[in-house]
Each structure stands twice: as structure tokens, then as C-alpha cells.
């Protein structure tokens, strides 16, 4: 870290996913040496995740920038209902502040998920964090990076139970 900084601007954001892409001008404020040292994080394989897999939360899991937390995956839902889609979600036994921006990486340092507070039942248990798998948000990230907004209908499906079916 060479302690350099540059002004950034919001390129695009998605309210439904809680994701934003910021951009920095490569020609203003960042030296060529600094640009040469910047590497993109690799994406991990969420298909290999299972209960008990160790996870590192980075970003601001404790509500403070540059903090980290450690935990294990306690539950995986590969088709959790969300607005306009099904998402791969996993729940970890670690305290995290999704609103402050937290990400899950595996022990290889690859990105496997983004903390999300959309499910209110998880918010009641501060020792559990819901992460949306990187495979579920990769297209959203690519769209936001290109400056496009995510198309949204605003539909969220629910399971039809016995009582609903026969009422």
C-alpha cells in the first residue's frame, strides 16, 4: 500500500441487490506504478461450498472499514426467493454488518459472496450473516460495471401451501 488516493464516482447501483459500482479515472490521480499493483479478486466456486466450510468476511463486517470476521457456513439455500429471481444464498455463523459492505472470501482468497440484509428474519440474530453467492450477483455486477441498470419487474414469488391451494 503506497497510501495514494483518488476521487471516485458512483457509476451505477442496484437498490434491490444492495450493490454499487464506483469508478476512478485511470488518467487522473493514480500513478502508473499504482495501477500496475492493482489486481482484481478472483471468483470462487459456490458449487463447492457445503455446511461447515470456513469463511472470511472482509470489508466492514464489524461496521468498521478494514475489519474482518471468521466463521463457518451453517446453511445453504441454492434457490432462495428474491425480487425477480432465485438466488444462491448461504448463512454463516459470524457477526457482520451487511449495510456497511461486507464480502465473503474462501481460504484461497477468492470472492464467494456478498453480505445481504434483505431477509429480515436473519437480522434478528446478529451472530448470523446472510451472503448471496457470487454466481447469483455476477451478472448484476457486470451490468453495473457496464453502466447499465438492472431490469426490474418487482415480482417476488411465494410457495403455495395446502391452505392457499384449497381456499
Give, region by region, the residue ranges found by the protein language model:
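Sec-exported extracytoplasmic/periplasmic mature domains
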Residues: 57-60, 78, 109, 142-146
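Short, conserved beta-turn/loop elements at beta-strand boundaries and strand-helix junctions
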Residues: 13-17, 74-83, 160-163
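Conserved active-site neighborhood of the chymotrypsin/trypsin-like protease fold
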Residues: 1-59, 63-64, 94, 98, ...
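C-terminal cap/linker of serine protease catalytic domains
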Residues: 8, 111-167
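A short glycine-leucine-enriched loop at secondary-structure breakpoints
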Residues: 45-48, 102-103, 108, 167
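Active-site region of chymotrypsin-like
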Residues: 26-40, 69-128
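Stable alpha-helical elements in mature extracytoplasmic
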Residues: 6, 48-51, 65, 69, ...
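Generic preference for hydrophobic
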Residues: 55-57, 104, 155
Amino acid at each position: 500500500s503506497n497510501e495514494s488516493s483518488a476521487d471516485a464516482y458512483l457509476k451505477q447501483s442496484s437498490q434491490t441487490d444492495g450493490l454499487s459500482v464506483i469508478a476512478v479515472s485511470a488518467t487522473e490521480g493514480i500513478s502508473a506504478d499504482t495501477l500496475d499493483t492493482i489486481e482484481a479478486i478472483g471468483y470462487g466456486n459456490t458449487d463447492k461450498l457445503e455446511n461447515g466450510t470456513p469463511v472470511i468476511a472482509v470489508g466492514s463486517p464489524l461496521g468498521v472499514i478494514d475489519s474482518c470476521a471468521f466463521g463457518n457456513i451453517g446453511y445453504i439455500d441454492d434457490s432462495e426467493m428474491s425480487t425477480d429471481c432465485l438466488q444462491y444464498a448461504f448463512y454463516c455463523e459470524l457477526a457482520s454488518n451487511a449495510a456497511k459492505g461486507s464480502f465473503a472470501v474462501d481460504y484461497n482468497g477468492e470472492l464467494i459472496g456478498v453480505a445481504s440484509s434483505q431477509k429480515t428474519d436473519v437480522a434478528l440474530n446478529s451472530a448470523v450473516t446472510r451472503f448471496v453467492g457470487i454466481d447469483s450477483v455476477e451478472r448484476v455486477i457486470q451490468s453495473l460495471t457496464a453502466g447499465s441498470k438492472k431490469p426490474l419487474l418487482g415480482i417476488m414469488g411465494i410457495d403455495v401451501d395446502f391452505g392457499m391451494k384449497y381456499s
